[in-house]
């Protein structure tokens, strides 16, 4: 057990996170900004945990040294979370009365009451320090996806019948070449000092895990001074970095012809009964050197989403405007999953927009696409949740974003007392909305047709908190930025009644806000979709 306490201080003055992050962290590596309209968190890693599934290589680094182990990352995380269990919270009195009683609810945040003039008994938000980062899609090799417990088709052995048993079950990388060494299969920061922004109440908290109050106070004082020196210069922002003279080219891993051919191949497997639904995706790249933070700020303005995020891993970064929640765990052990299946573009007039949204979920295809994945998520949660606790609380809800309407269902369940977020993650990963169903068979077909690793795309990112809570988003609508290259994925669910050309256009529709943000940031006069 660690002899640490959680110290937090509520500041009397509000600061906009879009001003704070560039001022405190723009010139630093290993930083994060989990960012949305209700709660945001930002800070810098005190440790970095990287993992490769090909040889079970786990590395743990801080500023002074790197420790290398042969250990499964889930085993490591189980031990770490257990060792931090029971860390007490210590609040530093604020300079003014607390706001009136309210209950906050946020994609990234928590839900705890605060009374007028009362001292807080704990932070209002769920993240109290812990792990921030991602698990890439290929981490499925160490989850229940590669166990026959992961799902059944109407045939006795969906893995055998999908003709890709080696790809989806036997080989740890699902038949693919090894991932880019610069991008681990999983990469997490350990975070013990961070800022938490409550956007609803315009409150800013400084939070520190420390063995003594003096160390926490020193960090509070230093950070408060930096915040007090902020100017208004960051409030105005030129989204265009520079004029990009050459035509900007976006290149997919599958051409239009190949993607449509793969859709038809998926449908053959579906008709044979090897699967019910397959999520086929495409990877798109652009060779360009660009300021990652400038691009992220362009993306968050153009395509605001429940799970915006910027995570700088040093030699690459994750820039996300993900709309989809994978898994959330609250302080009472309640799990929420919100699979997103069913998409339609926005209308160019209000009347047309409402009509398109109204139709979503009412067609047989949209309904089937969503409900199949709801059943899959219920099955995944059933491995780890209390019997009888799993409920579909909000089926087939239409949610609207900048470029699309999406069909979302909400499933809840209660974790069994002997389980935690790591058990849940291994039971449910990868998210069924990005595989299809049955999960094992769908993963095998995906491996056969896509032929390249998905990498970070279609995995999950977010936080695992030391207090047992977690919030993880699906890694979609997300740019992975290298020093001189950008990449992102897009795709959709294939059913027997899918129209191949329409599925291809839906893939492009989902890629549109990412392409638009890149073009806007570069100031490119022309761009080419090399599809």
Annotate each language-model stretch with its function:
Residues 90-122, 152-165, 171-173, 177-180, ...:
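A cross-taxon signal for low-complexity, glycine/charged-rich
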Residues 1-87, 122-147, 180-240, 244-531:
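Extended alpha-helical targeting/anchoring segments
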């Amino acid at each position: 057990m660690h002899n640490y306490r959680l110290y937090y201080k509520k500041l009397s003055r509000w600061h906009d996170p879009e001003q704070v992050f560039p001022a405190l962290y723009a010139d630093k590596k290993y930083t994060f900004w989990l960012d949305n309209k209700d709660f945001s968190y930002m800070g810098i890693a005190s440790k970095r945990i990287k993992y490769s599934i090909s040889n079970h290589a786990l590395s743990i680094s801080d500023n002074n040294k790197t420790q290398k182990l042969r250990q499964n990352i889930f085993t490591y995380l189980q031990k770490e979370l257990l060792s931090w269990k029971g860390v007490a919270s210590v609040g530093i009195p604020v300079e003014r009365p607390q706001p009136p009683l309210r209950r906050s609810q946020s994609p990234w945040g928590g839900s705890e009451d605060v009374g007028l003039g009362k001292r807080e008994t704990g932070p209002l938000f769920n993240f109290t320090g812990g792990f921030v980062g991602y698990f890439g899609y290929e981490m499925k090799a160490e989850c229940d996806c590669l166990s026959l417990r992961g799902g059944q088709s109407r045939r006795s052995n969906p893995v055998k019948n999908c003709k890709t048993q080696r790809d989806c079950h036997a080989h740890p990388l699902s038949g693919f070449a090894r991932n880019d060494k610069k991008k681990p299969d999983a990469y997490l920061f350990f975070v013990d000092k961070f800022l938490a922004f409550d956007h609803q109440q315009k409150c800013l908290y400084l939070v520190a895990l420390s063995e003594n109050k003096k160390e926490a106070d020193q960090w509070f004082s230093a950070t408060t001074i930096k915040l007090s020196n902020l100017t208004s210069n960051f409030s105005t922002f030129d989204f265009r970095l520079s004029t990009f003279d050459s035509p900007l080219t976006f290149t997919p891993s599958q051409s239009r012809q190949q993607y449509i051919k793969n859709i038809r191949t998926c449908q053959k497997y579906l008709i044979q009964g090897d699967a019910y639904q397959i999520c086929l995706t495409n990877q798109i790249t652009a060779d360009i050197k660009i300021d990652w933070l400038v691009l992220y700020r362009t993306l968050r303005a153009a395509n605001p989403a429940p799970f915006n995020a910027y995570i700088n891993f040093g030699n690459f970064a994750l820039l996300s405007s993900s709309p989809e929640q994978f898994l959330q765990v609250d302080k009472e052990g309640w799990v929420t999953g919100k699979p997103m299946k069913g998409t339609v573009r926005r209308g160019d007039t209000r009347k047309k927009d409402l009509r398109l949204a109204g139709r979503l979920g009412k067609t047989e295809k949209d309904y089937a696409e969503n409900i199949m994945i709801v059943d899959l998520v219920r099955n995944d949660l059933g491995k780890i949740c209390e019997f009888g606790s799993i409920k579909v609380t909000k089926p087939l809800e239409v949610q609207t974003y900048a470029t699309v309407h999406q069909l979302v269902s909400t499933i809840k369940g209660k974790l069994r007392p002997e389980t935690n977020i790591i058990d849940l993650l291994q039971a449910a990963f990868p998210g069924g909305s990005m595989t299809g169903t049955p999960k094992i068979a769908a993963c095998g077909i995906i491996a056969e047709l896509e032929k390249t690793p998905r990498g970070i795309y279609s995995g999950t990112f977010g936080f695992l908190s030391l207090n047992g809570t977690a919030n993880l988003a699906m890694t979609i609508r997300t740019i992975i930025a290298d020093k001189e290259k950008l990449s992102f994925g897009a795709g959709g669910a294939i059913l027997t009644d899918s129209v191949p050309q329409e599925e291809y256009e839906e893939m492009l529709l989902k890629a549109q806000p990412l392409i638009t943000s890149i073009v806007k940031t570069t100031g490119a006069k022309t761009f080419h979709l090399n599809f």
